[in-house]
Amino acid sequence: MEKLRIIFMGTPEFAVGILDTIIKNNYDVVGVITAADKPAGRGQKIKYSAVKEYALANNLTLLQPTNLKDESFLAELKALNANLQIVVAFRMLPKVVWEMPNLGTFNLHASLLPNYRGAAPINWAIINGETKTGVTTFFIDDKIDTGAMILNSEIAIEPAENAGQLHDRLMNLGSTTVIDTLKVIENGNVITTIQEDNNDIKTAYKLNKENCKIDWTKSGDEINNLIRGLSPYPAAWCFLKDKNEELSIKIYEAKLLEEAHSYEAGKLISGKKEIKIAIKNGFIQLLSLQLPGKKRMQVAELLNGITFSDEAKVY
């Protein structure tokens, strides 16, 4: 059994949960690589990544390269003398980095590969109405999320679950799967499976303003899945127009109501405590939303200070 000397690479909160589990299982993490500090928010203050915050709090050796091919970074990386690297929600690695340790570099990806390769697997699984998803560990190669698979674990997606809730459950599942992967590697019992490509593979495209916008002519399930799949971040959005005022709103939570009606898709109907949007097979009842420059609020709270006319619509 070879004693593992691990370098961990990751940036967001999802990666922190995995790193914490590795540390708590008494593995030797000789270095942590995370994104360089960036200014964020209105004040453009320097913001540390979640992984950096964790590494500093736990006195772990930390490197923050801007260029992964930089000679000085590569020298520092080599000097850590790791025999295994683990990547969780980081960035694409050059070959000179991923082939450095003799036991290889493996990645934890939040989908059942080969489906949902790419930047936003948790979101797209919900957006596309999947009923199950999971996590996969695989050895990195020179493409994105295509390497030989080591282990995977599957869970059901709950009918009303949003991306944030699924994120947390997959982080827990991923932690267990990474530890199981470490055990087979250190015992020399790794059996990998090649990913098979076919035309039915679904992709986890990068999220942008365009693919986060609600199309109110789609079915109720499609709209509701988009809202769930983008909540709480970055959030599904649309335009709201009432008389001469137009603004963009973010919708965090909604409910599908299958009721017959004769309204045009996008018509907004509001009562004293509820807002419903007409769609082709019923209504989408809005539960939680955000107006520009305001905080997120429940619909009942919004209706305490605002009323809508009969002309109100979304698009």
Swiss-Prot record:
Gene Ontology CC annotations of this record: cytosol
Gene3D superfamilies referenced in this protein's UniProt entry, alphabetically: 3.40.50.12230
GO MF annotation list: methionyl-tRNA formyltransferase activity
Enzyme class: transferase
CDD domains the record matches: FMT_core_Met-tRNA-FMT_N, Met_tRNA_FMT_C
Catalysed reactions, as listed in the record: L-methionyl-tRNA(fMet) + (6R)-10-formyltetrahydrofolate = N-formyl-L-methionyl-tRNA(fMet) + (6S)-5,6,7,8-tetrahydrofolate + H(+)
Keyword set, alphabetical order: Protein biosynthesis, Transferase
Pfam family, one: Formyl_trans_N
InterPro entries attached to this UniProt entry: Fmt (IPR005794), Formyl_trans_C (IPR005793), Formyl_transf_N (IPR002376), Formyl_transf_N_sf (IPR036477), Formyl_transferase-like_C_sf (IPR011034), Met-tRNA-FMT_C (IPR044135), Met-tRNA-FMT_N (IPR041711)
Disulfide bonds: none
Domain of life: Bacteria
EC number assigned by the record: 2.1.2.9
Annotated (6S)-5,6,7,8-tetrahydrofolate binding sites: 111-114
Protein purpose: Attaches a formyl group to the free amino group of methionyl-tRNA(fMet). The formyl group appears to play a dual role in the initiator identity of N-formylmethionyl-tRNA by promoting its recognition by IF2 and preventing the misappropriation of this tRNA by the elongation apparatus.
Family of the protein in this entry: Belongs to the Fmt family.
Protein known as: Methionyl-tRNA formyltransferase
Organism: Flavobacterium johnsoniae (strain ATCC 17061 / DSM 2064 / JCM 8514 / BCRC 14874 / CCUG 350202 / NBRC 14942 / NCIMB 11054 / UW101)
